[in-house]
Swiss-Prot record:
It comes from Homo sapiens. Glycans are attached at residues 2, 30. The lineage of its organism: Eukaryota, Metazoa, Chordata, Craniata, Vertebrata. InterPro entries: EDG6_rcpt, GPCR_Rhodpsn, GPCR_Rhodpsn_7TM, S1P_rcpt. Residues 1-50, 106-117, 183-206, 274-288 are extracellular. This is Sphingosine 1-phosphate receptor 4. A lipid is attached at residue 323 (S-palmitoyl cysteine).
């Protein structure tokens, strides 16, 4: 049907689709009920919600830029943890940038986009969210494998494997996000279209939901196993310091699981209801979709706090980066700022130097296994 509610001839819809005309987006939005109460496609007022969305996306971008700059410039360690942190930060940075572009191209600008541009706008956000989720899955898998299989592995082999899995994460995320652009959509098949994302097929959304639900369930299962391993290690530890370390790890795992449930649960529930619900239901909860999507994107702002600032090494890197920036600008902050920066540099050098004897142990037959096992099982997990 068209904007006035009269049916649209299939041949005219196909002609619009073949020509990539923006009028096709108006037809799909009108059929799904998204134009109800808007005053027409030229009504672009989003008000305070749009401002909050822009602020949230800018927060995600700036926060991840800060962590990325600090990690790459002030962390000397190049273990697998380093590459996982960089990968998670990059994916969260892309999530914030994609969400910002999505918000700025929404409203009245939506109806000036060609269908391919609309698919690119939404697909980029799907790709970024998928890359962030797959990166968290890879990190959880590496962390679990390091705990249950503390076997010596050459640095080159480990690095190649990490690079391979990171590349696979991004390849799968890009493929998942661009499937509608490649043809899995519902152009001119209005009965198969989503109500919340009018050009997306309900089957495609259900496919994404199954994948994301499987990934998140796997992540929670891995962290549940890590929780039990760390709890068992803490109970067996005879020293108070080891027990405190185990409790710190337990708190980190609980924070990760809670962040996933709070940030991702509402979005999955909304999309699942969209697949099996009606257009009337979608119209009623349309405004809630914007808030729920913003909540999911805010998970990319929570990730640097959980994964980075719970690590003393990354905390030192961020503090050193900020203090060095202030000193370059000639700003003298609190008296302990310079002292903390010096401490951060000395701590990083100490960490770096402590890794060198570990390499020499690899050449020693008598100390080859027992000296590395505790470092692989506990301290590598603690560093995220």
């Amino acid at each position: 049907m068209n904007a006035t509610g009269t049916p649209v001839a299939p041949e005219s819809c196909q002609q619009l689709a073949a020509g990539g005309h923006s009028r096709l987006i108006v037809l799909h939005y009108n059929h799904s009920g998204r134009l109800a109460g808007r005053g027409g496609p030229e009504d672009g007022g989003l008000g305070a919600l749009r401002g909050l969305s822009v602020a949230a996306s800018c927060l995600v971008v700036l926060e991840n830029l800060l962590v990325l700059a600090a990690i790459t410039s002030h962390m000397r360690s190049r273990r697998w943890v380093y590459y996982c942190l960089v990968n998670i930060t990059l994916s969260d940075l892309l999530t914030g940038a994609a969400y910002l572009a999505n918000v700025l191209l929404s409203g009245a600008r939506t109806f000036r986009l060609a269908p391919a541009q609309w698919f690119l706008r939404e697909g980029l956000l799907f790709t970024a969210l998928a890359a962030s989720t797959f990166s968290l899955l890879f990190t959880a898998g590496e962390r679990f494998a390091t705990m249950v299989r503390p076997v010596a592995e050459s640095g080159a082999t480990k690095t190649s494997r990490v690079y391979g899995f990171i590349g696979l994460c991004w390849l799968l995320a890009a493929l998942l996000g661009m499937l509608p652009l490649l043809g899995w959509n519902c152009l001119c098949a209005f009965d198969r279209c989503s109500s919340l994302l009018p050009l997306y097929s309900k089957r495609y959304i259900l496919f994404c939901l199954v994948i994301f639900a499987g990934v998140l369930a796997t992540i929670m299962g891995l962290y549940g196993a890590i929780f039990r391993l760390v709890q068992a290690s803490g109970q067996k530890a005879p020293r108070p310091a080891a027990r405190r370390k185990a409790r710190r790890l337990l708190k980190t795992v609980l924070m990760i699981l809670l962040a996933f449930l709070v940030c991702w649960g509402p979005l999955f529930g909304l999309l699942l209801a969209d697949v099996f619900g009606s257009n009337l239901w979608a119209q009623e909860y349309l405004r809630g979709m914007d808030w729920i999507l913003a909540l999911a994107v805010l998970n990319s702002a929570v990730n640097p706090i959980i994964y980075s600032f719970r690590s003393r090494e990354v905390c030192r890197a961020v503090l050193s980066f900020l203090c060095c920036g202030c000193l370059r600008l000639g700003m003298r902050g609190p008296g302990d700022c310079l002292a903390r920066a010096v401490e951060a540099h000395s701590g990083a050098s100490t960490t770096d130097s402590s890794l060198r004897p570990r390499d020499s142990f690899r050449g020693s037959r008598s100390l080859s296994f027992r000296m590395r096992e505790p470092l692989s099982s506990i301290s590598s997990v603690r560093s995220i």
